[in-house]
Amino acid sequence: MLIAICVQDEISAIVLDPGFSTTRAGFAGEDTPKSVIPTYYGKYTYEAQEKLIFGDDIFVTPRPGLSIHNPMGRDGVVEDWDMAEKVWEYSFTSRLTGPKAGNPFQNGLNDVANGELPSEMEGVETEEKPLADSPLLMTECGWNPTKAREKTVEIAMEKWGTPAFYLARNGVLAAFAAGKASALVVDVGASNISVTPVHDGMILKRGVQHSPLGGDYISSQLRALFKTNSPQPITITPHYLVASKTAVDAGQPAQAKYKTFPPDKAPDASYRTLMEERTLSEFKECVVQVWPGPNKLSATGPNGVSNEEVAKSSPGRPFEFPDGYNQVFGIDRYRVVESLFDAKAAIPDPESVFPAPTQAQTVPELIKAALNGVDVDVRPHLLANVVVTGASSLLYGFTDRLNQELMQSYPGPRVRISASGNTAERKFGSWVGGSILASLGTFHQMWISKKEYDEHGPNIVEKRCK
């Protein structure tokens, strides 16, 4: 009996944090997710059969006709449930639980020569479910609709067979990760920016704001910049299309040998777009910088000199593209992100999938709208606990600029920003919060058990996971 109790305590819950760009999964109580995979998946046809590829394998080989898809919508709500389920399942079976054994009648213990089952095994399921031993905590955005929440608990209980389940809001978990029960959480992800007021561990729904100006929007601004770049427009050639290259001086045309694929062997255009996105991510990490303030980039600084002049005089940053073309980027590296704070600064691009941003979609305005949606008495407390999270918030200078904007808008109350200096914690804020929450002894009473789910149906998630 004692052994059974010890073993039971060893079972760790799994925390699953699905995003638009990546899906994070790991064991509760650990400080980073063991599994971080792209939420994108690949589809191609081989010998007249449709094949699917998940995880980092989508980057490896440009297979003929390989097309890239994403089951999530840009608003953070699932659009394709069948594929979302497969991607999520891959995230934990590939690194955490391992695929479960198939048919229990052919596992060496219960082999039946003629396929006849012993009568006492008639009702046994033919396949063990992937989460039969692990409770599951999943995250969701603050505006996830009821239908989507119910579908999530349904998949976890019925398809994966989890014994206990909980669905937690991203904003609340990011606040917990920063050690706060009340906070104003600014989450800058790949597909959107959200501002979530959290009070005593609950989100204040009327104050939740979000806009589509996330990391992918910044990538689209980079594409617009490269089209109008001088001395020459820049074409991004992904690594898989470069056979060899020769070093060239900055600003000189690339000297590279390119790979070509015959039409029947070439991957779909969506594969190239995904690979270009990897170069753009590298560019954002190495070059792009947020104008630190005070005031907008287009305004005049406190000393009477225009901010653009100051930006031009600061040293540039070099970057080399996969085909060997390289250039030093000056003021342009500030311009591509300025529209997160000033919509008028957006670089126009008629071909972009993103419409021109409005001022209401910028970070300072989202924060203003979020604070206006909550009780006046709570506002100073939220401003003293601003938590910044999300991978795109790692842009150089982002928190400095946010601090300047908030001090200008709210000179009275004390403004304090908490942004983890640890890259992993900032990228995986809501996962870390989920890991902390699911490993607390007092959290046991919060789980929705399989028994409760069977009694009340998927609607229980609305009552229990507020």
Swiss-Prot record:
Keywords annotated in UniProt: Activator, Chromatin regulator, DNA damage, DNA repair, Nucleus, Transcription, Transcription regulation
GO biological process, one term: DNA repair
Pfam families associated with the record: Actin
UniProt key word Transferase: no
Keyword Transcription regulation found: yes
One GO cellular component term noted in the UniProt record for this chain: NuA4 histone acetyltransferase complex
Location in the cell: Nucleus
Gene Ontology molecular-function annotations: chromatin binding
Main location: nucleus
Record function comment: Chromatin interaction component of the NuA4 histone acetyltransferase complex which is involved in transcriptional activation of selected genes principally by acetylation of nucleosomal histone H4 and H2A. The NuA4 complex is also involved in DNA repair. Is required for NuA4 complex integrity. Component of the SWR1 complex which mediates the ATP-dependent exchange of histone H2A for the H2A variant HZT1 leading to transcriptional regulation of selected genes by chromatin remodeling. Component of the INO80 complex which remodels chromatin by shifting nucleosomes and is involved in DNA repair.
UniProt record similarity statement: Belongs to the actin family. ARP4 subfamily.
Subunit record text: Component of the NuA4 histone acetyltransferase complex, of the INO80 chromatin remodeling complex, and of the SWR1 chromatin remodeling complex.
Protein name: Actin-related protein 4
Species assigned in the record: Aspergillus fumigatus (strain ATCC MYA-4609 / CBS 101355 / FGSC A1100 / Af293) (Neosartorya fumigata)
Gene from which the chain derives: arp4
